[in-house]
């Protein structure tokens, strides 16, 4: 059942509710754009169970020691609150500069979106993360329920970046962050005190640790496939 506006205002953070009105790119299973849909529409399991699918990205930032920057999502987040995840996970919007019908156009769009959201969530200025240094690797199609009425059903573009960044955390988006080595992340996965987003665990289980071993040559892992997970 879709919750009433009055109930939402009582239960959820005002800023996070506002962001639920942003317009995502609804796609088919081949990542062909069909129309726009609000973030709220795209994340309701009622719609996901009918096949609604949207475009997303997952950014992984590594420092000069090849440590991965993780974030813990804020308690205020409507979907997957307080879970640990990769550096930044969000969506290109159905706006100029972030749309894309062909794969090269779509990759450029998600890079623009990633730069926008890295600033919004982590306060990373564009000068530290030039888009021409973003490495697109592949796309992953997955579905995962969250709590209550919410979930994810995405074609997720994977982006890598290696470099030094300065952070200015937005507490409405992120409650904590840390840099980890591959072994430290594996230890976190086995520690029950940590909870993780399903897409991050899925990416790590199927792809991430192989990519991480050769992060300086990540371009060799690039493909044009959509991996169904």
From Swiss-Prot:
Residues 52-202 form the Nudix hydrolase domain. The active site is at 89, 154. Binds 1 Mg(2+) ion per subunit. Mg(2+) binds at residues 43, 54, 152, 154. Its cofactor is Mg(2+). GO terms for biological process: dimethylallyl diphosphate biosynthetic process; farnesyl diphosphate biosynthetic process, mevalonate pathway; isopentenyl diphosphate biosynthetic process; sterol biosynthetic process. Pathway: Isoprenoid biosynthesis; dimethylallyl diphosphate biosynthesis; dimethylallyl diphosphate from isopentenyl diphosphate: step 1/1. This is Isopentenyl-diphosphate delta-isomerase. It comes from Schizosaccharomyces pombe (strain 972 / ATCC 24843). The gene is idi1.
């Amino acid at each position: 059942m879709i919750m009433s506006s009055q109930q939402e205002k009582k239960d959820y953070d005002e800023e996070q509710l506002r962001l639920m009105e942003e317009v995502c790119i609804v796609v088919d299973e081949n990542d062909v754009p069909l129309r726009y849909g609000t973030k709220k529409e795209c994340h309701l399991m009622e719609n996901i169970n009918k096949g609604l699918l949207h475009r997303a990205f997952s950014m992984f930032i590594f420092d000069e020691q090849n440590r991965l920057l993780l974030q813990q999502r804020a308690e205020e987040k409507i979907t997957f609150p307080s879970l640990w995840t990769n550096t930044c996970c969000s969506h290109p919007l159905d706006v100029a500069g972030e749309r894309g019908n062909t794969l090269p156009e779509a990759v450029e769009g998600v890079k623009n979106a990633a730069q926008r959201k890295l600033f919004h969530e982590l306060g990373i200025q564009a000068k530290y993360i030039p888009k021409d240094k973003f490495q697109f690797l592949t796309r992953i199609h997955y579905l995962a329920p969250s709590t209550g009425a919410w979930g994810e059903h995405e074609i997720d573009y994977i982006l890598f970046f290696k470099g030094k960044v300065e952070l200015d955390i937005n507490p409405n988006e992120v409650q904590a962050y840390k840099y980890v080595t591959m072994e430290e992340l594996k230890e976190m996965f086995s520690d029950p005190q940590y909870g993780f987003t399903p897409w991050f665990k899925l990416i790590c289980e199927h792809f991430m640790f192989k990519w991480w071993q050769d992060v300086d040559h990540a371009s060799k892992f690039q493909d044009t496939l959509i991996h169904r997970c």
